[in-house]
Amino acid sequence: MLSSTLLCQNPLQEFDTTLERLFTFASWADKFDGAVHQAPIRANTIALNEPVGVMGVICPDLAPLASFITLIAAALCQGNRLIVIPSENFPLPAVDMYQIFETSDVPGASINIVTGKHDELITTLSEHNSVDGIWNFGDSKYETEIDRASVSNLKQIWTINGNKVNWISSVSY
């Protein structure tokens, strides 16, 4: 039996938070352009923000809808393509989002959702040479495996280092 602490205690609050995050990250999508810096020797230096590329996103079990939407919206607004492993115990919010993605203006194949056991999927995702970065918000027990499997192609890795995230907090992202 799954612990009730994995589920959001207030589903309505989770849904409202999810909608707020979608609007927040949608507004950020056009605000990450580059800048021109004046160099001290009468020259210009151009700074461009570029997407990572193909990112693997591993979602936690806590607040499955809010965490899924927050993670994909943040990565997608930067121009990345995503391979998302949703919550292992509660994948239905992510799976239901398939229908919304298909009928929305989200470019095809920019969000790919793969459900299954995290033990099996994380190693495959980490070893894949076409994945440029891994964003792990899943269980911290996978951090060592992600590090080991990602060495061959030097992909970028971001993890929460065992910390817990309050996905429903009103902290501005």
Locate each region found by the language model.
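Aromatic/hydrophobic pocket-lining residues that form π-stacking "cages" and hydrophobic walls in ligand
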Residues: L22, L71, M97, I146
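Short beta->alpha linker loops
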Residues: M1-L6, Q13-T17, E88-L92, G116-K117, ...
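Conserved nucleotide-cofactor-binding alpha/beta core module
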Residues: E88, V95-N112
